């Protein structure tokens, strides 16, 4: 697995981008996102009702992307020690569960994909491949853990079946309009199977809901940077929403695509 870690000026720029979007995400969450989306639509105009989500896309998310690990290195690149939960607003019950985490038992059980569920997948170092499944559905694959997420636009409704590791995701465009520079994709995910926010057993429950914002930032060299703001809400194991960002650099081809199975540790 290859990861990209910027240095010098690029490191500083990317870190500032990350900080900016954490703040922005918090503002969005507090404002219930609707008012901001309305304001953005006023600038860029809403897409025509006759357009499909694919045709109306205000930003280009398709292609191959590699994660850039500029923060939380010790949680994302190595398996953190039991008890190292810094930054996660855990409830006492969540801490009790995490303190009992045993990687050997996880491996023995065969249930080793708990840290590859939707709330944690974009924190796993690796690559993403994003394509349009059809005019209404965006497909995201990860080589790490061989996971697939489906983002459904329009009035799609989940099947109401069993909870799954990637859940049911409903997507919508916010702001902009095709050709705009300030659009975003908002994804709301529910019906999740319980899993881990981090490799060392930090839990999230099946009551978890996930809100994500996908945006594209143009870097000084003209290359695109995908910034994903991830807001995890879990009334069972989190005292407040857990807000993080992940960044991805676009790659020209699938030359470095390397599917690997889930693992309980790194």
Model regions and ranges:
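Repetitive helical segments and hydrophobic/amphipathic motifs
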Residues: 28-29
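PEST-like low-complexity, intrinsically disordered acidic/proline/serine-rich tracts
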Residues: 21-22, 32-266
């Amino acid at each position: 697995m290859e990861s990209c870690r910027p240095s010098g000026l690029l490191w500083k720029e990317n870190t500032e981008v990350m900080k900016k979007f954490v703040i922005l995400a918090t503002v969005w969450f507090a404002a219930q996102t609707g008012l901001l989306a309305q304001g953005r639509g006023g600038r860029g105009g809403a897409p025509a009702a006759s357009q499909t989500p694919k045709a109306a896309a205000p930003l280009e998310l398709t292609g191959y992307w590699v994660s850039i690990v500029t923060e939380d290195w010790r949680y994302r690149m190595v398996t953190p020690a039991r008890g190292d939960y810094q930054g996660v607003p855990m409830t006492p019950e969540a801490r009790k569960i995490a303190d009992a985490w045993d990687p050997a038992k996880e491996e023995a059980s065969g249930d080793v994909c708990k840290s590859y569920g939707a709330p944690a997948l974009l924190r796993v170092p690796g690559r993403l491949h994003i394509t349009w499944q059809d005019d209404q559905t965006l497909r995201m694959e990860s080589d790490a853990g061989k996971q697939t997420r489906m983002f459904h636009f329009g009035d799609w409704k989940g099947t109401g079946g069993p909870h799954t590791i990637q859940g049911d995701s409903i997507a919508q465009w916010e702001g902009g309009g095709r050709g705009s520079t300030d659009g975003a994709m908002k994804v709301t995910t529910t019906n999740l199977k319980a899993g881990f926010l981090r490799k060392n057993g930090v839990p999230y429950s099946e009551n978890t809901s996930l809100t994500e914002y996908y945006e594209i930032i143009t870097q000084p060299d003209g290359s695109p940077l995908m910034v994903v703001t991830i807001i995890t809400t879990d009334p069972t194991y989190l005292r407040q929403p857990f807000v993080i960002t992940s960044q991805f650099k676009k790659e020209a081809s699938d030359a470095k695509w390397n599917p690997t199975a889930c693992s309980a540790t790194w």
